[in-house]
């Protein structure tokens, strides 16, 4: 059996694409008062809720116990990378200098990960 034969059984024939946006706290994050940070957090979460309601943001949330403490959260979009980056750059926390973003396309074997639409129940 050749390596090609072995790979044929290990590599999926089809992939699902997920666009992941990583939120990082920049080393030189703009300082704000606690009151201003609370307001920005409300604006940030409201913005993300709107993207979910539009059906372009699949899932999002903060990170915990990460290897790089600058990593603050991730968002998974139902969009191509360039479109997701454009929306992520419009996040009020990005505009305020509290987050910077990085993105990637994540390929998973077709059907192995399922995200419910808002309002769906498992």
Model region roles, listed by residue range:
Residues 1-122:
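Conserved, structured core segments of small domains
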């Amino acid at each position: 059996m050749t390596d090609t034969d072995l790979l044929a059984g290990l590599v999926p024939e089809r992939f699902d694409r997920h666009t992941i946006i990583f939120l990082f706290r920049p080393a030189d994050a703009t300082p704000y008062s606690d009151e201003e940070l609370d307001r920005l957090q409300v604006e940030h979460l409201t913005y993300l809720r709107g993207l979910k309601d539009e059906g372009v943001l699949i899932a999002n949330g903060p990170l915990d116990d990460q290897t790089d403490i600058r990593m603050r959260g991730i968002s998974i979009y139902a969009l191509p990378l360039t479109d997701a980056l454009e929306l992520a750059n419009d996040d009020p926390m990005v505009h305020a200098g509290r987050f910077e973003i990085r993105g990637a396309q994540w390929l998973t074997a077709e059907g192995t990960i399922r995200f419910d639409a808002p309002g769906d129940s498992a």
